[in-house]
Regions:
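FIC/Doc superfamily catalytic core
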Residues: 1-315
Length: 315
């Protein structure tokens, strides 16, 4: 590979998906990123961690990852637990990585694999074969990665395309002795996050996990074809699905919040905002947004003052 753009074609599918992603991002941003509540943010991060690990055969799953994040002890092999801890630490620094700096990618690999590999953070020194794919010789890896990052830094491609192209080229080079899949997916997220921080909230890796066979087939198809096009199309589809999933989850979460607030008001018409916050584990601003929405929809009304009044349910 040289500094030229890796080979790919702009297909009608790529154009359509790019447009759809832009439209869905606008929907997500229209309400503000704060609309995605902290619980959903945490849930999506856990989905991301579980997804990227399960693709590599670590099936500790969302429940145990949640427990680990909460500081609880869980059962698992030393390697499984080390992989989870490494993934948690690597993704915690998502906002700090510079997408076009090779040293930052090496740092990410060091963090991810530190308890697993003695060579964590260093390129492989041996030749490897992945399935039917014979990766470039170990002696070529450093130059190939320098060139890939030079292209990443200097090319004019849209960041959506850059993220997909980088992901495939990285997997093709296979620069590390282990952890390539996890780093490839992480770095696509880093590139997307640098384009728009809202991408850090999306569980794209968990969607890829659900389409794991298609993921590997897209890599194989691109390798056979000698260009990135099949993989770009596949990953754009995964990004689109992850945005749609988040929109639906957030809408469902907000609907549930509305119903919970309403149920508590029906149970106790004199319930205060503070009591609602306590019972539902929501912030004051979150409760006030729900109340405003219910008022705007003419479902509730406040009779009297906040101190001595009560809620009137109109439905």
């Amino acid at each position: 590979m040289n500094n030229n753009t890796p080979p790919y074609k702009i297909t009608s599918k790529i154009l359509k998906l790019s447009t759809q992603i832009s439209e869905e991002l606008t929907k997500l941003q229209f309400t503000g990123t704060q609309k995605i509540n902290p619980m959903l943010r945490k849930k999506n991060r856990i989905k991301t961690l579980a997804g990227t690990l399960e693709i590599e055969g670590n099936f500790l799953g969302e429940e145990k990852i949640t427990a680990i994040l909460d500081g609880k002890r869980v059962l698992g092999t030393v390697k499984e637990l080390a992989e989870v801890q490494g993934a948690i630490k690597a993704y915690e620094k998502l906002d700090n990585y510079r997408f076009d700096e090779l040293d930052d990618l090496l740092l990410a690999h060091k963090i991810l694999m530190d308890e697993i590999l003695t060579t964590a953070g260093s390129f492989r020194s041996v030749n490897v074969k992945v399935g039917e794919h014979i990766a470039p010789k170990a002696s070529m890896v450093n130059e190939l990665m320098i060139n890939l990052f030079s292209w990443l830094k200097n090319s004019d491609e849209h960041m959506l395309l850059k993220s997909c192209i980088f992901h495939y080229e990285f997997e093709f080079i296979h620069p590390f002795s282990d952890g390539n899949g996890r780093i490839g997916r992480l770095w696509q997220s880093v590139i997307l996050n640098s384009f728009n921080p809202i991408f850090s909230l999306l569980p794209t890796e968990s969607i890829v996990r659900d389409y794991q066979e298609e993921y590997y087939k897209a890599i194989e198809d691109s390798t056979e074809l000698g260009e990135n096009t099949p993989f770009i199309e596949f990953m754009l589809e995964m990004i689109f699905k992850s945005i749609q999933t988040t929109l639906k989850s957030d809408q469902k979460s907000n609907y549930k919040s509305d119903q919970k607030v309403l149920a508590l008001m029906k149970e106790n018409s004199k319930i205060t905002i503070y009591e609602l916050m306590e019972k539902l584990s929501m912030s004051e601003s979150g409760i006030k947004k729900v109340i405003k929405k219910l008022k705007d929809e003419n479902i509730i009304n406040r009779v009297g003052s906040l101190k001595s009044g009560h809620w009137e349910i109109k439905e």
